[in-house]
């Protein structure tokens, strides 16, 4: 017997097993009894039901970059982290945008996966849709504005990629 949020499969010997799965791959539980399984981009918890409420001191010891966040403008999920690159899938809600900003130590490449919107790169406005690729060099001011829900794969490239490398500007007047 299993209870689930997200995709999970339980065999006939499973008892009192609870699964919360935020990943896009299934979780298979076989012969499990009295456990909680929680899987997200932040990590995976497998715990006896009686111990699950003791998670906080252990989670506080984990030092890692946030891998998924929901914001007022949409959401993002970190797909991959390498020594000189980070790949992030960004979803912008219709009518929302990123700040008009620049980075001193990294280049960025946006690949539009779905939806429609517009970019402003160093004051130049351009319409974008699925399949378009926009490249920004370090120091370049840029933003993206969603007309419809917009999914963007953002690749950050550089030797010093960090969250503090961001300068925000006022958006220039556009059409």
Task: Show where each model-derived region lies.
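Left-handed beta-helix
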Residues: 1-111, 116-121, 125-134, 143, ...
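Double-stranded beta-helix
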Residues: 62-64, 69, 143, 147-175
């Amino acid at each position: 017997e299993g209870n689930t949020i997200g995709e999970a499969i339980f065999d006939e010997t499973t008892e009192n097993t609870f699964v919360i799965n935020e990943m896009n791959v299934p979780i298979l539980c076989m012969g499990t009894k009295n456990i909680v399984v929680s899987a997200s981009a932040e990590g995976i918890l497998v715990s006896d039901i009686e111990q699950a409420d003791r998670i906080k001191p252990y989670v506080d010891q984990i030092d890692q970059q946030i891998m998924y966040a929901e914001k007022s403008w949409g959401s993002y999920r970190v797909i991959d982290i390498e020594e000189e690159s980070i790949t992030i899938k960004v979803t912008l809600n219709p009518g929302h945008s990123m700040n008009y900003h620049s980075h001193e130590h990294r280049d960025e490449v946006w690949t539009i996966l779905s939806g429609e919107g517009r970019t402003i790169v160093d004051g130049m406005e351009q319409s974008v849709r699925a399949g378009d690729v926009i490249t920004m060099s370090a120091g370049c001011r840029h933003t993206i504005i969603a007309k419809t829900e917009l999914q963007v794969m953002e690749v950050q490239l550089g030797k010093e990629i960090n969250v503090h490398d961001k300068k925000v500007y006022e958006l220039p007047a556009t059409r």
